[in-house]
Amino acid sequence: MDIFKYDVYRGPNIGIYTSANDEKIFLPRGFAKAKAARLEGYLGAEALYTSVANTRLMGTLMVLNNSGIIMPSTISEIEYEFYKKHTDLNVVVLDTKFTALGNMISVNDRGGVVSPVFPREEVRIIADALGIEVIQRRIAGYNQVGAMMVATSGGGIIHPETDGEDVKRISEVMGVHMEPATINGGIPFVSSGLLANKKSVVAGSFTSGPEIMMLTRAFAG
C-alpha cells in the first residue's frame, strides 16, 4: 500500500474537500486539473468535478463505498442527477435533519459505524443503500463517528483514545483491523486529513514520519 502526502487549498485537510471509492474521486468544481491528475495517479481512480449542496465539502457531506452514495437532503436536483449519470452507484438521499453525513457515518464495503443520534429507520436505509451491516456507537466519546475513523477494504485508522473494546467491535464490523492513530501532526479527527481506497492512501501534508509509519501498518492488508 502506497502512502502519499498532499494538500488541498493550501492546507492539509484533504478529507474535508474530497471523497473517493475504488473507481471515482469526487472533487469540487474548479479543482486544479494538475492536482486532480496526481490524485488520479495515486488512487487509480477517475476524477469527477461536482458539488454537494452547492458547496465543495465533499468529504464532510457525503458517504460512499463501492456500492452506493448517501447524500444529505440539501443536495440539489442537478447534483443528484449528476451522480446518477456519472456513476453506477446507488444514489440515496437521506431524509434526515443531519447534513454533515460524512462526519456522522463511516463505511467500507464490509460494514459501517453510524452515529447513535440517527433513528433506527434511517440506520436501516443507510445499511440497505450501501449493502452493508452497520452498528451505532460513539467513538472516543464523540457522536461524530465519521470524523473519528477511516476504513478501506485493506485496513483502517481510528481516534487514538477509542476504548479497546470499541476498537475490537468496530474492527469486526468493518472486516479489517482498525489501528488507533493520528493525522497531520497529531490531529485525532482522522477523516479530515485522509483520502483512501484499495490502492493507496493520501494523507494531509502535515502528516509526520511516525504517522506515515502508522498508516503503512494500518493499511497493510
UniProtKB/Swiss-Prot annotation:
Biological process terms in GO annotation: cytosolic ribosome assembly
InterPro entries per record: eIF6
A Pfam cross-reference name: eIF-6
Signal peptide: none
GO molecular function: ribosome binding; translation initiation factor activity
Keyword annotations of the record: Initiation factor, Protein biosynthesis
Function: Binds to the 50S ribosomal subunit and prevents its association with the 30S ribosomal subunit to form the 70S initiation complex.
Assigned protein family: Belongs to the eIF-6 family.
PANTHER family reported in the protein's UniProt record: TRANSLATION INITIATION FACTOR 6
HAMAP family: eIF_6 (MF_00032)
Protein name (Swiss-Prot/TrEMBL): Translation initiation factor 6
Phylogenetic classification of the source organism: Archaea, Nitrososphaerota, Candidatus Cenarchaeales, Candidatus Cenarchaeaceae, Candidatus Cenarchaeum
